[in-house]
UniProtKB/Swiss-Prot annotation:
One of its GO terms (molecular function) is naringenin-chalcone synthase activity. It is an enzyme of class 2 (transferase). Belongs to the thiolase-like superfamily. Chalcone/stilbene synthases family. CDD domains: CHS_like. Signal peptide: none annotated. Pathway: Secondary metabolite biosynthesis; flavonoid biosynthesis. PROSITE patterns: CHALCONE_SYNTH. This is Chalcone synthase 1. InterPro entries: Chalcone/stilbene_synt_C (IPR012328), Chalcone/stilbene_synt_N (IPR001099), Chalcone/stilbene_synthase_AS (IPR018088), Polyketide_synthase_type-III (IPR011141), Thiolase-like (IPR016039). The primary product of this enzyme is 4,2',4',6'-tetrahydroxychalcone (also termed naringenin-chalcone or chalcone) which can under specific conditions spontaneously isomerize into naringenin. It catalyses: (E)-4-coumaroyl-CoA + 3 malonyl-CoA + 3 H(+) = 2',4,4',6'-tetrahydroxychalcone + 3 CO2 + 4 CoA. GO terms for biological process: flavonoid biosynthetic process; polyketide biosynthetic process.
């Protein structure tokens, strides 16, 4: 009789040898594009709020300072005209919003996933795990199930559905994908973040900060993560070296979201940028001390662009050169704040720009990098990345 394996031998056989690696990235947006310069007039007109002249001026100033050039939104003028309750400030409208997002969130996620799978170049039957993240709507079975059906993934694919996480979750999904890939030899994890603002859009009110209406946009991003890539058929982009999550001290209530009959309402304290910048150096030190790195300009940066004030204050706090946030600011400008999807858009922009600009690595010529997610809690996700050489 053959000797049975020990638990230790089983565990060793189950685990990958090397670090989790991003093997492909895909992004998608709705077709409807709105330009920030035109948005205040459009927003106050469609919500029948032109009589609020002072509030409109305030909103115009916010849009002017947002550093956003354009955003993409599933909600068109026609959809909003057909759903007047979504244009009111606090009218019951959850059913209408849900009816939109439970269909459109998986659909937009599918578009991003198809691009990632095409770049990866392997049969989708090799996908072993699916992580789906959205802050837009809730259903059972969830968007993970819908996407599995849409893409024709194996029924045995291991799914994880993340609802209502918010803007830090682009870091969360990478942390989870890293653990899944490294603890399951041969695993290939499809990660999808799909966000549609149909749950948060509402008319203006003097009691509302209007920050969300000025910043949020729609988008979906997908990555494929696996360890021990077969470099004859797979092309690594970034290695996921470490990942952590923390709740910032004295930050309770700084960002809250509440799903109610009126949709998803957001409440933000003015000091969110200050709270993040005050704690950013500690997060960097905790992540990079084991690597002997303490020059924050020597690493590439992918930071969730919650808004321009956050980026400005983080830059000032750690004396960052302006070019470190170039990819981050580009995505903010061209897409707005797409919640969890943003950092994956920035990762995509960085590897493309690195190749176009003739850099030697996917991280703007640098070896080490950091990815930050900021969101409700205040919660901060910190992911340490290692770039790979740029290949033609």
């Amino acid at each position: 009789m053959a000797a049975t394996m020990t638990v230790e031998e089983v565990r060793k056989a189950q685990r990958a040898e090397g670090p989790a690696t991003v093997l492909a990235i895909g992004t998608a947006t709705p077709a409807n594009c709105v330009y920030q310069a035109d948005y205040p007039d459009y927003y106050f007109k469609i919500t029948k709020s032109d009589h609020m002249a002072d509030l409109k001026e305030k909103f115009k100033r916010m849009c002017d300072k947002s550093q956003i050039r354009k955003r993409y939104m599933h909600l068109t003028e026609e959809i909003l005209q057909d759903n007047p309750n979504m244009c009111a400030y606090m009218a019951p409208s959850l059913d209408a919003r849900q009816d939109i997002v439970v269909v459109e969130v998986p659909k937009l996620g599918k578009a991003a996933a198809q691009k990632a799978i095409k770049e990866w170049g392997q049969p989708r039957s090799k996908i072993t795990h699916l992580v789906f993240c959205t802050t837009s709507g809730v259903d059972m079975p969830g968007a993970d199930y819908q996407l599995t059906k849409m893409l024709g993934l194996r029924p045995s694919v291991k799914r994880l559905m993340m609802y209502q996480q918010g803007c830090f979750a682009g870091g969360t999904v990478l942390r989870l994908a890293k653990d899944l890939a490294e603890n399951n030899r041969g695993a290939r994890v499809l990660v999808v973040c799909s966000e549609i603002t149909a749950v948060t859009f509402r008319g203006p009110h003097e009691f509302d900060s209007l920050v969300g209406q000025a910043l949020f946009g729609d988008g979906a991003a997908a990555v494929i993560v696996g360890a021990d890539p077969d470099e004859s058929v797979e092309r690594p982009l970034f290695q996921l070296v470490s990942a952590s999550q923390t709740i910032l001290p004295d930050s309770e209530g700084a960002i809250d979201g509440h799903l109610r009959e009126v949709g998803l309402t957001f409440h933000l304290l003015k000091d969110v940028p200050g709270l993040i910048s005050k704690n950013i150096e500690r997060a960097l030190e905790d992540a990079f001390k084991p690597l002997g790195i303490d020059d924050w300009n020597s690493v590439f940066w992918i930071a969730h662009p919650g808004g321009p004030a956050i980026l400005d204050m983080v830059e000032a706090k750690v004396n960052l050169n302006k070019e470190r946030m170039r990819a981050t600011r580009h995505v903010l400008s061209e897409y707005g704040n797409m919640s969890s999807a943003c950092v994956l858009f920035i990762m995509d922009e960085m590897r493309k720009r690195s190749a176009e600009d003739g850099h030697t690595t996917t991280g703007e010529g640098m070896d080490w990098g950091v990815l930050f997610g900021f969101g409700p809690g205040l919660t901060v996700e910190t992911v340490v990345l290692h770039s790979v050489p740029v290949t033609a």
